[in-house]
Amino acid sequence: MFRGKFETTIDVKGRTSLPAKFRDVLFETFGDERFFITNSNPVRLGEGVYSSGLVVYPYKEWLALEEKLMVGTGLGLSSAELAAVKRRIVAPAIECVADKLGRVLVPPHLRKSAVLEREILFVGMLNKAEIWSQAEWEKVCRQDEQNFPIDSPVLAELGL
């Protein structure tokens, strides 16, 4: 599973390095070096203010997601909402394989939507990973502090 937070950089051409631990997870846990990068769901930071990163989906996880979106039933989304999800998540997605040095190219349309400039983070989220600009990550973490389910029985049951 993807765990941890890794600070790195992205150059002006969109080249960055997938953390070695994440490359290992792709192959050892998910059995494939291929992955997809796409937009994440927007995170609401306030009235009319949203932040967004990118998501790295292992190949098999992405195919399973596509299948669910293709069928569309049982998701609890209207046809307009489902179309919006497909436009935001599926349309911009790119299939990737890191080179022998772990480098990957993030295309301009994804860099722009996630406001990726120089300092970026790869964040493990168990079955997927996220890519954030340092500034956007800090905003989302502040929001997470407000949204954290303090005294949640569910968290207590999990041992957290």
Curated annotation (Swiss-Prot):
Keywords: Cytoplasm, DNA-binding, Repeat, Transcription, Transcription regulation
A Pfam family this chain is assigned to: MraZ
Main location, first listed in the record: cytoplasm
MF (Gene Ontology): DNA-binding transcription factor activity; transcription cis-regulatory region binding
GO BP terms: negative regulation of DNA-templated transcription initiation
Gene Ontology CC terms: cytoplasm; nucleoid
Compartments where found: Cytoplasm, Nucleoid
InterPro entries: MraZ, MraZ_C, MraZ_dom, MraZ_N, MraZ_sf, SpoVT-AbrB_dom, SpoVT-AbrB_sf
Domain SpoVT-AbrB, first and last residues per copy: 5-50, 93-136
Superkingdom, natural source: Bacteria
Complex and partners: Forms oligomers.
Cited HAMAP family: MraZ
Family per similarity comment: Belongs to the MraZ family.
NCBIfam families hit by this protein: PRK00326.3-4
Protein name, per record: Transcriptional regulator MraZ
Gene name as annotated: mraZ
